[in-house]
Design a protein with these regions (language model features):
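Gram-negative and organellar
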Residues: 126-512
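Signal-peptide-cleaved, periplasmic/extracellular N-terminal interaction regions immediately downstream
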Residues: 12-135, 139
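Residue-level detector of intrinsically disordered terminal segments
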Residues: 1-2, 21, 422
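Gram-negative bacterial Sec-dependent N-terminal signal peptides
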Residues: 1-14
């Protein structure tokens, strides 16, 4: 299940293992009294079809793929008889609607599917378990197929819950243990998944990479952000190592060079200001079960004596996750004034992500921000709101999705210096961005590109927003990431078009 795990882990739109037919929810479901129906699905060339059936579900495995359009046409013809249809390059799962039963048979390269009323018996079952294939084995294959379908549709937690009792019943079944490891990795329990890979002696590239990542990492990155009035160059070096199964600790250092056309200071308006900032970080991640984790951070801006702490809690599986954010005076150089005089930020926020369908994901976050400078408390307060949706409408290569993002901040208090200038001048901002996103894999590389438009409702600085990113494995222990683009999304204290470029090289420390 290497590709299955890989599809779940990619943050950008990936190439999912299984495709899903879109069904019409407005069609009236069939009643048990309706007559039986038979539909055919014909492969364009010779194929070997292996069927596994239950009263309400059919799993078909094949050695030649079938075109998506033919499966979508089959789903349309089935209409209200069909509850679910999912497929990949070598299997498909057909589930009957409520009040219906299902049976299937294979004749050469033709699959014949019968939809029957609940009360009607199946005349001639297509699959009778033989002594070589006991009923328990058939049931096991069906349950594994269900787990694979759930995982490929973007529900790794649901798949893991199916697999856990199977792993307890069949502890020596390496296929089940491998699938369970894939789900643990997809949910973020990397150490648990890597441990399971070692126990079954998995040696494929995906497993080796996961085992390498589980041992910690050292990462170096450089970022350039440029705008009309404010630009920054940032270098980062950090390391993270596991201490047991549920705890990882790390440390890092950041150096930022900032250049601002104008800065509001205690002596008036400063021009062409260049500032250098060095920040040291201490990090810890606590894994709480399979689906939750707590991230802790302590940071110090050593040249300005600004210190702070923060925490983020992620609760729940990726398909239904809640987030809580708390920060107290963490060093912050997001605005010209903060980068010049030593800035900090305090935050309290909450948010979440939910997958409504295999294609549609919603997310929303909101919170309070307090911006301050060295030697002072909060000088500017705001309420920040962000959210969006992702809709994946093409699963084959390249994958295609449309996205919407809201990025807004509403300032409710700004304190002034004795000279009448604000300590940190911020204004309301509300950005609405729409993008088309494409993703494609080449060998060891995943490339994602996005292009669209941002509407600035308050600042009226509408413009393009586009980016391209590439992530690749140089080998099992090294990863290279590069991304760049243009953004018209206004940031705190900065509006207008901005360019950015980021390159990161990561060395993973785990053994495999």
């Amino acid at each position: 299940m290497t590709m299955l795990g890989a599809a779940l882990l990619l943050a950008s739109p990936s190439l999912p293992v299984l495709s899903v037919a879109m069904l019409d929810d407005e069609v009236t479901q069939p009643s048990p009294g309706q007559e039986a129906r038979a539909l055919s699905l014909v492969w364009p060339s010779d194929v070997k079809l292996v069927l596994e059936t239950s009263p309400y579900e059919v799993v078909v495995r094949f050695d030649r793929p079938i075109k998506d359009a033919m499966l979508q046409a089959f789903a349309k013809d089935a209409g209200a008889d069909l509850a679910d249809l999912r497929w990949n390059d070598n299997s498909l799962v057909i589930r009957a609607a409520s009040g219906r039963r299902i049976d299937a048979s294979a004749q050469g390269r033709t699959l014949i599917v019968h939809f029957l009323p609940e009360s009607q018996d199946v005349a001639a079952p297509s699959l009778t378990p033989s002594p070589a294939t006991p009923a328990s084995d058939t049931e096991l294959e069906l349950e594994i197929a269900r787990a694979e379908a759930d995982a490929a549709a973007g529900y790794p937690d649901r798949a893991r819950r199916r697999l856990v009792p199977l792993a307890e019943r069949y502890p020596d079944n390496k296929r089940i243990q491998r699938l369970l490891g894939d789900m643990e990795v997809a949910e973020g329990a990397l150490v648990l998944g890597a441990t399971r890979y070692r126990e079954i002696a998995a040696d494929d590239p995906f497993a080796r990479q996961a085992m390498a990542e589980a041992g910690g990492n050292i990462m170096a990155a450089g970022t350039i952000r440029g705008g009309k009035v404010f630009s920054q160059v940032e270098g980062v070096l950090n390391a993270l190592v596991p201490v047991g199964r549920n705890l990882a600790v790390g440390a890092g250092v950041r150096h930022v060079r900032s250049k601002a056309d104008t800065v509001l200071g205690p002596t008036g308006i400063l021009t062409d200001v260049v500032a250098h900032t060095t920040i040291a970080d201490a990090l810890a991640t606590v894994q709480i079960g399979n689906t939750s984790r707590l991230e802790l951070q302590g940071s110090a801006q050593v040249d300005e004596k600004v210190y702070g702490v923060g925490a983020r809690l992620f609760a729940g599986a990726p398909e239904r996750q809640a987030r809580v954010l708390l920060a107290y005076r963490l060093p912050d150089v997001a605005t010209p004034e903060q980068s010049t005089f030593g800035g900090h930020i305090s935050r309290a926020g909450i948010g979440g992500t939910i997958r409504l369908t295999p294609e549609l994901v919603l997310q929303a976050d909101g919170g309070w921000n307090g911006y301050g400078l060295r030697g002072t408390g909060v000088r500017t307060r705001s309420i920040a709101v962000s959210g969006g949706l992702d809709y994946l409408f093409r699963r084959s290569s390249p994958s295609l999705a449309i996205t919407y993002r809201l990025d807004a901040e509403y300032v409710n208090r700004t304190r002034l210096r004795p000279n009448g200038l604000p300590f940190i001048p911020l204004s309301d901002r509300e950005n609405h961005s729409f993008q088309l996103v494409a993703g494609k894999s080449w060998s060891k590389w995943q490339v994602t590109g996005a292009a669209g438009w941002t509407f600035d409702r308050i600042g009226n600085t509408n413009g393009p927003t586009a980016n391209i990113s590439a992530t690749g494995r140089l080998n099992d222990g090294w990863r290279l990431q590069a991304s760049g683009g243009v953004s018209s999304i206004s940031r705190p204290g900065i509006s207008g078009r901005q360019l950015y470029l980021r390159v990161a090289l990561t060395r993973y420390l785990g053994r495999f």
